[in-house]
Amino acid sequence: MTKWFAYILLASVCLLLSCGGKSVREKFAEADRLVNENNLDSAAWLLEEQITLSALSDSDKAEYGRRLAWLHLLQGRSLVNDSLIDYSVDYYKEHASEPLLSAYFVKAIYMGDSRKGLEQRRALYREAIDSAYSRSDSTYLVRFYDRLTSLSFGEGLYRETIAESKEWEASPKAGFKEMAYYMAGLSYSRL
């Protein structure tokens, strides 16, 4: 009889403890609030210590990877260990989700921090530009063109930088054309 009582008591305590916590979405909202208040360390603690990755659904896992990598970027931390951003980009591409462009942006920075190959990073920017163009998102279109031309220029690929700058300049949806002219001019001066 005491054995059954102990089992019932243990089950009740477990049930009581499991009901008291916030949902993952509430924790994400709380982390967003902390980031907006510039409490980055508290937001990092919340995401890194209070969320169990193995218990997340696929969509929550993608969101977790994107948010954590973005937070590390805001903190100025290296993104070398944020390989979950790969999962986030793949998930958002597969489901045509809204956060895809910000995930691309963070993944490109992650690839730079982890010293991925130049062609891989250029291909990622190309893919991101296509996605931003199809969504008519001029903000991310400018960001991705800027990063792509800067990457190419930094690697000494001046002819490619000129071609990318001309493409940027010809794009009806991308703004900041003066940056495209500037990158093309710099590249012409190096030929």
Language model segments and positions:
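A "functional boundary" signal
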Residues: 19-191
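Positively charged n-region of N-terminal signal peptides that target proteins for export
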Residues: 1-6
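Bacterial N-terminal signal peptides
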Residues: 7-16
